[in-house]
Amino acid sequence: LRVLQVDSGREWRGGQNQARLLCRELARERGVEQVLVTKRGSELARRAAADGTTVFEVPWGWGLDPRAWFRVNLAVSEFKPDILHAHDGHALWMAHKTLGDARLVATRRVDFHVGRFSTWRRADRIIAISTAVKNVLAADGVAATEISVVPDGIDPDEIRRSAEQPLNVRGQLGLPAGTRIAVNVAALVDHKDQLTLVRAAAHARPTDPDLHWIVAGEGELRGPLTAEITRLGLTDRVHLLGYVEAADALIRESDVFVMSSKEEGLGSVILNALALGKPVVATAAGGIPEILPADALVPVGDAVGLAGKVLDALSHPPSRMPFPERFTAATMSRGVLALYRSLL
């Protein structure tokens, strides 16, 4: 079985890590050969190569870069894959324009709607990372037979190892050692909705004035978030750290992990928090309810409810939730491999 994995590698987020983990796990399977095509010099290229994956790095700028398209075609003609697996929308456009007779698989990680003439409809099979994503695709008219649900997965031991080196975020922020902190790790983009998290911080302050909120991530929402933090008088309680490479160490130092998304394919960073034994509070967006029990969830946009759940988790910490086996990288890889084989 020959598989050409394609990811634009434009950033390093959960989707790129899933592509890396899939390549790593498939390399352990007998009879599977694979090559990863991704952006030259990207974090995905670096990390996948460090895992031992064969990586074909290509120039890949913004937009539909013809240089990348040419080199994806070159990789297809040289490698002659049975399966061409696209891991994001840009990769899918490149993949569906290539020459050859490989079966086209595409992983859909977001619960956004797809248009009538979307390239996503060109795939032989779409992997939805949650039932919520599958339901959105089905509502948009994609045939159920063309969608398979394979949840994201992580390596819990890898997460724990990556969190071993202390970050000492309290010290960096000049906070006393015992200060309670609620942590969010997500890009600062509209669908992650950290504005609701900031408003939750305002609602929580009268009850727990010493609670600090830390947001790790970067993006277009930084300006509006900074303005809202200032408007609510929270500049000494809500801290925007920007991108934090040692995100797992940050999560490990938290007292509670918080997600405030209004749209979410699955929310795989929640899995990292569970692997580190942290209580999690989140909005019931997209696939998040497929990970967390109902008593850890609040409605999307409910800042008051989010504040209340965070305060409850701090005052009455829930029992440590065992890590669910269905969300391991090994389980994810087995599901994807079974799908590949079903197409041949």
What role is predicted for each listed range?
Residues R13-R24, R180-H203, W213, E220-T226, ...:
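A conserved mid-protein helix/loop that constitutes part of the nucleotide-sugar donor-binding site
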Residues L36-T38, P279-A282:
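Short hydrophobic beta-strand element within catalytic cores of glycosyltransferases
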Residues R160-L175, T230, P318-R320, P324:
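A short helix/loop element that forms part of the nucleotide-sugar donor recognition site in Leloir-type
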Residues A132, G153:
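Carbohydrate-associated surface elements
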Residues D295-V304, L311-H316:
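Conserved acidic donor-binding segment of nucleotide-sugar-dependent glycosyltransferases
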